[in-house]
Amino acid sequence: MTIVAGPVEQPTPPGVARVDVKTASEMFEALDTALSAGSVDLLAMVAAVSDVHLENPLAHKSPKSSMLSDLGGLQWAQERDLLGALIERHGARVPSLGFAAQTLPKEGDRPAALRSLGEEKMRRKGADALFANEVGRPGVGFESETNEGVLLVRDEGDAVTSRTSPPSMAKDALAGWILDHLLTGGVIGY
């Protein structure tokens, strides 16, 4: 197993290779190299990189007196869609799992909204499976010990099935739940 990690403080589990990167471009290159090197059971893109980057970052800290005008003049560019680009390049031989952190309206059927948003994202990227979860709600997602959401799996006929996770699962238990469903759903096999 290889982890390609951005700047995080998480320890690397024993027996796992780790490649540290700082930018989305470095992450793409490291993932592309790992996927090109041989047999891969699953490409799991479990965390997002930034959606945009500065074209020409400031070379120095901006003084308070000119900060607003300096920041207003910065040019932004959209980051490459790493999952979509890797699937386009390696998809036929590499099963893929994406994650989609979504914000939802306060009212309505949350699992149905996650299914709809997740399925659109999964199809757009060409992923075999995608876990959609809500962010911005206390107790789940970022900066929480628990999470919950909807796992979408695409079969060979392009039909999508979904399963809603149990509520507020510990993240390591949720990872096991997802892997179990990927195995039984035929996304990865042993």
What are these regions (language model features)?
Residues M1-Y190:
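A cross-family phosphate/adenosyl-ligand binding-site feature
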